[in-house]
Design a protein with these regions (language model features):
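Hydrophobic core of transmembrane alpha-helices in multi-pass small-molecule transporters
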Residues: 22, 90, 102-120
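Residue-level signature of mid-helix packing/kink "hotspots" within the transmembrane helices
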Residues: 57-65, 155-156
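Helix-to-loop junctions at the C-terminal end of transmembrane segments
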Residues: 63-76, 166
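C-terminal ends and interior cores of transmembrane alpha-helices
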Residues: 85-100
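Cytoplasmic helix-loop-helix junction between adjacent transmembrane helices
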Residues: 109-151
């Protein structure tokens, strides 16, 4: 505890951001597997199950587009905490009787989860850039590499966690457990994250979401189609 207390404020903030991101990523991966397995058990066709994730991806793309704008306007602490809160709501929406879980209802819950995921991811990665001092690009790349690399590993762990929770608990029980744990993470985040983290001094305009560089805008559009193709294949 003494060693933790001796850390700089920036390192402490990085640990809070990383902890938030890890907790969220675990629940996100688990939720994906839980939805696939549970609705397969209910007799949903493969196409119907795929449709459940349609809004998740679409609303994630939209959030990705405007996330930086929101982060600069509101502060990255707020966008991260909003993302955590929305994920809790999405999980609680799915903790209802089975007869309520229609395709449209689950798609709406998944849309909220998609928004939450990209708010959380954007906030985590942007927060690191805000916490690293100017001229320390090596440290920035190292921290981002840890965060990004851990995402893929933890999402895989989340898949196994989802299957385990469905085996040990019911679908509803798994949703309630994850919502409860994430609520605790959210409450600590509200307390621990700086209120001015990543907040721009000058309010950006909405048009600032597009880069002034034509090359970057083209690259962004290409990535949109790339990830769209990946999700269709997956």
């Amino acid at each position: 505890m003494k060693r933790l207390a001796s850390l700089s404020d920036d390192i402490k903030q990085y640990l809070v951001v990383t902890g938030n991101y890890w907790a969220f990523t675990l629940t996100d991966g688990a939720l994906r597997m839980l939805v696939v397995l549970h609705f397969h058990a209910l007799g949903y066709s493969p196409l119907s199950i795929a449709m459940l994730f349609l809004f998740y991806e679409i609303f994630g793309v939209v959030t990705n587009l405007v996330g930086g704008f929101l982060g600069a306007r509101l502060g990255l602490n707020k966008t991260m905490n909003i993302g955590l809160a929305i994920q809790v709501i999405a999980l609680l929406m799915l903790a209802v009787p089975a007869e309520w879980l229609t395709v449209v209802y689950v798609m709406i819950a998944q849309a909220l989860s998609g928004i939450a995921k990209d708010l959380n991811k954007m906030s985590a990665k942007s927060s690191i850039k805000a916490l690293v001092a100017a001229g320390q690009e090596g440290t920035l790349f190292k921290w981002v590499a840890v965060l990004t690399g851990s995402k893929n590993a933890l999402k895989g762990v989340g898949f196994f966690l989802g299957g385990l929770l469905l085996t040990l608990l019911s679908f509803k029980g798994a949703m309630l457990l994850m919502a409860g744990v994430l609520t605790l993470v959210w409450c600590y985040s509200l307390y621990a994250l700086k209120s001015d983290l990543g907040k721009a001094k000058n309010k950006p305009k909405f048009t600032d979401i597009f880069s002034k560089s034509r090359s970057i805008n083209i690259l962004s559009a290409a990535r949109l189609f790339l990830f769209g193709a990946r999700d269709v294949w997956f």
